Amino acid sequence: RLLFTFNCRRFNNLEEIDEFAPDLVINAATVKYTIEAFNKVLPHLPEKCILSDIASVKTGLPEFYAKCGHPFVSTHPMFGPTFASLSNLSNENAIIIAESDHLGKVFFKDLYNELHLHIEEYTFSQHDETIAYSLSIPFASTLVFAGCMKHQDAPGTTFKRHLMIANGLMSEDDYLLSEILFNPHTSGQLEKIQAKLSQLQVIVENHDSEAMKHYLEEVRNNLK
């Protein structure tokens, strides 16, 4: 069925890879098993086969690629089935790692362009910094919201939207959430959240209307 419907072939054992001799292997294993999956197939791959991962967490991958003896291409589609509309990805983004093999980058640029994704090229280091900002901040903020919430019989629209995001986040794999939050750059982002919360708390406790006005103006400017 896979062969005739999707032009795919399912292998029943690793030895079938030897005969197939792929030019590119895309690793779609969960973050916890990405490197383990690579190690299992490596003995069966041609020397020039390009290794590819689409992992959201790149921990350990630069070191693995440096010693694996194969060209590689590492990318990160910045969306998932929880919130993205997979039938329309024109508003979604993808990152291609700059250190990747040229041919591998060309392949994924063509693929992501066909999906109408916006593409950015970052180094491994820049990717980690970006993830700390774009994932760790909303993840941490959502966890704080969910950690403080209690059941509401008549929730407002804003609460329901936050609740929907929280439920979506908590449906993700615990290991994935942990690894994203354990990003070395996350701690600095959490400090910024704490600083802003402390500032807001002082304003609220003092009923300082002028300070609140400036605070809200600053937030609106950040959203531009």
Predicted segment positions?
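Rossmann-like NAD(P)-binding element
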Residues: 15-42
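An accessory alpha-helical subdomain
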Residues: 121-224
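Rossmann-fold dinucleotide-binding core
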Residues: 57-122, 128
